[in-house]
Amino acid sequence: MKSRTTILGLSAAIFTVLSFYSVSPSVAADVPPLEERAAWFRHDRFGLFVHWGVYSTIGRGEWVQDTGKIPLAEYIKLYPKFNPEDFDAAEWVALAKSAGQKYIVITTKHHDGFCMFDSKLSDYTIMHTPFGRDICKELADECRKQGLKLGFYYSIMDWHHPDYTPVRPWEKGKRSTKGADFARYCKYMKGQVRELMSNYGPIVALWFDGGWEHKSDEDKKAFKDIIAVARQLQPNILVNDRAGIGGDYKTPEQRIPATGIVDKEGRPAMWEACMTMTTGHGSFAPTAWWGYDAHEKIFKPTEELLHKLIDITSKGGNFLLNVGPEPSGKIRPKETERLEAVGRWMDKYSESIYGTTASPFRLLPFFGRVTQKGKRLYVHIFDWPKDGKLVLPGLESMPAKAAVLGRPDAKLGMKRNNRDGIDEVLLMLPKEASDPIASVIALDFDTRPVVKPLVIKPAKDGKLKLPAAFVEIRAKHGQRAKPVSKDGRTCVGNWSNPNDVAVWCFTMPKAGSYRVELDARAASEAVVGQRVEISVGKSKLVAKIA
C-alpha cells in the first residue's frame, strides 16, 4: 500500500507552552560572480545591526514619527538638538568584535529621512546638528582599523523628502504632495547611494529597506539603476532583497525560517535573519522596536540569543543582531552585557559557527542543532541528557573521532545501532555539560558524512507521536514561539503569536480516523480556555484547552 506524506499544522490564538530569484541590473563586466563576492558572508555568519538616528531622542522606537503621528514641522525640530557626545566608534566596533561579530550594518538613513552621514544633497544630516561629525565615516575608519567589515542600511521610504510619496495615511489632507515627483526623488536617492559608495572605503553590503510602497515597472527600473551605480563603485558589494527586484540574499525579519531558504531550483539560498534584542514590552506594545525604546522592559536573554545564532547557522543563514543606541551615543548596558556574554561563548566555540554550512539532519530527537564543516560535524547540545546518551539518527557512517570542545580530557563513547532499518550513532557523553547554554561535540569522519532523512511514522501499535523536538515553527514577521526545554523535555514555548504555526511532516500507511491528544502546559492559568486549531491537509480540528 502506498504511504502518504502528511503535514500537520497547529496554531493557537494565545498559547503559552513551556541565490533565489534575482533581477540583476546591467553592471560593469568586472563585477565578480556571486559565489566569489559572497565568500565572506557565508563564512562570517554573525553581524551587528545598528538602528540609530534622531528618533532616539524621543526614545519610542524608530517609527515614532509615524506611530506617534508627529507632524513633520514638529519632528524636524529634533535634529538641531541631537548631540550624541558619548558616541565612540572604537568602543562600538570593539564591542561587536568581542561578541564574535564579523561585520556591522548601520542605518545611514531610516524612514524619517534623517541622514547619519555627510551628504551634500541635503541639510537634514548629522553634519547640521550640534554634534557635526560624520558618524558613518568614523565607524568606517574604525572598522578598517579593527578588522571588521561594514555595510550600509538605506531606506527607500522617506517621510521628510518633499518628492517622496505616498505620505503616511494619517498625513493625507494635512501634508501637501503638490509638485511631488518620485522620479526626482529617485535621482536624489541615486546621488546619496553614490556618496555612500564613494566616500567610506570598501562597503560589503547595501541593505535597502522600505521599498514595499513602490512596485511599478518604472519604479523597479529606477531601483535597478541605483543598484547599478552601487555595483559600479563597489564591485564586490552584496545587495539585499528589499528594493523589490530580488537581490543577492534574503532578509527574513524577526523570525527564523523553519528549514532555511532555498532558491527556485531547490538549492540553498543566501539569507540573513535580522532580529532585535527587544521583545515588545515597551512603547506601542507588542512591537519590538529596532531604535532606542526607553520604555522597553524585557530583553532577550543571552541563552536565547545564542540558541538563535546556532539555529540560524544550522539552517545555512546569517544572524544580524540589532542594538538601538541611546541618544547619547552609548549602547545600552543590557545590550552590551548580552553581547559580551555571547562573546564569551564564541571565544570557546566559534569554530562551530564560522565557515560552517547547514546541518545534514532534517530532524533531531534532542534539544540542539548541528553545523557542518567538510568532514566534521559540530553537535550543539542545549539540554544535556541526564542519562548521558545522545542519538544521531540516520547517520550512515561512524565517526573516526569525537571530542568535547573546550574539554580535551573528557571521555566520549560511540556505538553504532540500527533501529527499524535506520542507522544511528549513539554517543555516550560525560556526566556534566561543558557549557550551561550550549555544549559542543566535534565529530570527525574519514569522508564527508552522509545522513539519511528521518521519517516520522506510526509505531507498530498504530500510534503516531509528534514530539516538539521534531517540530518546524513556521512564522511570519514577529515570531514569538520557540523551542525550549523543561526538565529534559523539549516543548514549544513562548507561543503568544497566533501567526506562529507548529508543523510536523509525517508519513501514514493509510488514511483513517485518529484520536488527537495535545499536551499543553503553562506557568499560569491564562492558557485555559484558549483556542487551538489542528489541521491535516484540508481537515481541521478546533478545540479549547481545558
Question: Which residues fall in each region the model found?
Answer:
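Positively charged n-region of N-terminal signal peptides that target proteins for export
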Residues: 1-5, 96
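Intrinsically disordered/low-complexity terminal segments and short unstructured peptides
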Residues: 4-5, 15, 489
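Intrinsically disordered, low-complexity segments enriched in glycine/proline and serine/threonine
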Residues: 5-7, 536
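Hydrophobic residues within membrane-embedded alpha helices
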Residues: 7-10, 441
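Bacterial N-terminal signal peptides
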Residues: 9-22
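Sec/Tat signal peptide C-region and signal peptidase I cleavage site
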Residues: 23-28
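Mature catalytic domains of secreted/periplasmic carbohydrate-active enzymes
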Residues: 29-513, 520-546
